[in-house]
């Protein structure tokens, strides 16, 4: 469902629209998906600077806010931990052109303190830019704390 809503899968009946417009098929998509497993979607042949440049290059302050060390920009994805990759994945999705974020378990690879820091930063950016956000999570206390509305899906594979 997240891939459909973010425009990555388009073999279904109907349209996904944002602000009355269909999602673009080729250029930058204003709906960005933050994957649960960033190691599966990052090009292993690109250094992390290239991974960010594909979307945008945040300034040094934002890199620091997300706990990304500048030295990591010269590394390949396989040289970073899951938590470090997740920080890049989240930051990459926060392109200034992004209007809506779909966050699929975006903090599960992070320790508790970093989870709070990243979520606080993301929520602040989402509010300041007047963006929308869909959070997919099994962490119900987290969902209850940060979500305005909650929809529960049970056994969606059994449908």
Roles of regions detected by a PLM:
Residues 6:
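Helix-to-loop junction immediately C-terminal to a conserved catalytic motif
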Residues 11-27:
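Conserved ABC transporter NBD signature motif
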Residues 37, 44-59:
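Q-loop/switch helix immediately C-terminal to the Walker
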Residues 76-80, 84:
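Conserved ABC ATPase signature
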Residues 90, 102, 118:
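Hydrophobic anchor residue at the start of the ABC signature
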Residues 116-129:
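Helical segment within the ABC ATPase nucleotide-binding domain
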Residues 137-138:
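H-loop/switch region of ABC-family ATPase nucleotide-binding domains
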